[in-house]
Amino acid sequence: MKLYSLLSVFLVILLATSDSDAFTRNNFPKDFLFGAATSAYQWEGAVAEDGRTPSVWDTFSHTYNRGNLGNGDITSDGYHKYKEDVKLMAEMGLESFRFSISWSRLIPNGRGLINPKGLLFYKNLIKELISHGIEPHVTLYHYDLPQSLEDEYGGWINRKIIEDFTAYADVCFREFGEDVKLWTTINEATIFAIGSYDQGISPPGHCSPNKFINCTSGNSSTEPYLAGHNILLAHASASKLYKLKYKSTQKGSIGLSIFAFGLSPYTNSKDDEIATQRAKAFFYGWMLKPLVFGDYPDEMKRTVGSRLPVFSEEESEQLKGSSDFIGIIHYTTFYVTNKPSPSIFPSMNEGFFKDMGVYMISAANSSFLLWEATPWGLEGILEYIKQSYNNPPIYILENGMPMGRDSTLQDTQRIEFIQAYIGAMLNAIKNGSDTRGYFVWSMIDLYELLSGYTTSFGMYYVNFSDPGRKRTPKLSASWYTGFLNGTIDVATQDTIQLQSNISGSSSL
């Protein structure tokens, strides 16, 4: 590795954009939030400290055959280093920080007694953020169900989860709601149900028997729809509680987030256009149509039939309007076609992708470790939601680019990726989308749920070999700082000199 013994590294980046794409932070409304994100299991570590009990991710990462992906036992050690991280956020100029609460740290048995040390940690974290002028955006659930509830009744495929999730949410609203004004109930609800109960790639690892993944239990033709149904009802129940009991005094907002691929027809044929609409109904409408109109998309009801649960009239009314905003998690875009071609997941005999009945082809020239930007995909998502779902308020809760671990601090490709998506988001806003915030994934290097420590998304490098988990800024941290404080404009052929205070080395 080539070393540069410099106190500062100056890089010149040519940002080639069109005149119409030129923008600065000032082009966005003053109350628009720019931030960065993490999640509890991926950031905190300290999995067996101060009363925390195992979540399903602890079990999954330790017991399932996932190669050398590791686990989140220590990860970035945010539990002990949160003050240092908040200071870095403040230095970066973050306006908001999105994090999740570990249910099993706050309520170790899943219900009942609150863990005072867990409660104190989150109170201190929120206090630290606010003291530095950073708005907390709190996710209640990011894949990490207490293992005790999974063992007791099977977690999200059992309607008992609705009552337990609502009780857990009640504790969070009561204890943190005076200082938290933005709540996301459940993280990327669509891909959570698919990954956990159809594909078996995330806990509890359920899927039908197949030659690709060795799931010990599950039914891919029914369980993802059961889980999705209970996710929606749990969200609606928590939202109803918040609005009846807390909203009038706490003045906050509550929403649900979905994972959204950009989806575009592979050709201009009518068949591909119909296939794309069907894919949007399954990927977006599965969660969004109940939240806005109270029922599932007709395309899903026709295809899935009796395997798709039915909302009662009361449930339908409770769902409508239960999200004050929609959270969008977006990374990449696919072309959609009816014609056979490689799909995003291996073909299986049953499940969500068979029901959807389309083939998906990557629109980006990407590898597992490096994604090409396709910002037009995000712009298309925002336009579609505006037109199809009454233009709800939207927060882009995750967007970012993976790179190989220990590759470089000069992550210029990540900078180009992020600025391209911010530009696309601005275009959508100019066209009427009610988008109100953007969060880079991720604030610092973390334990990535699907790739472990083989990839990193962070704007700060974390040395996972160092017991102290030393943080070092990447160039993207300096770029984001400059963009947020107005010293960097994204404009036509601008030559922008970024100063990154990287001591000793620009490569790792």
Curated annotation (Swiss-Prot):
Binding annotation for a beta-D-glucoside: 42, 142, 187-188, 331, 398, 441, 457
Signal peptide boundaries: 1-22
Catalytic activity: Hydrolysis of terminal, non-reducing beta-D-glucosyl residues with release of beta-D-glucose
GO cellular component, one term: plant-type vacuole
Residues carrying covalently attached carbohydrate according to the record: 214, 219, 365, 431, 463, 485, 501
A Pfam family assignment: Glyco_hydro_1
GO BP annotations listed: anthocyanin-containing compound metabolic process; carbohydrate metabolic process
Disulfide bonds: 207-215
Keyword Iron: no
Alphabetized GO MF terms: beta-glucosidase activity
Catalytic residues identified in the record: 188 (proton donor), 398 (nucleophile)
Keywords: Disulfide bond, Glycoprotein, Glycosidase, Hydrolase, Signal
EC number from the UniProt entry: 3.2.1.21
First-level EC class: hydrolase
Entry similarity comment: Belongs to the glycosyl hydrolase 1 family.
Protein name, entry field: Beta-glucosidase 10
Taxonomic lineage of the native organism: Eukaryota, Viridiplantae, Streptophyta, Embryophyta, Tracheophyta
Gene name in the database record: BGLU10
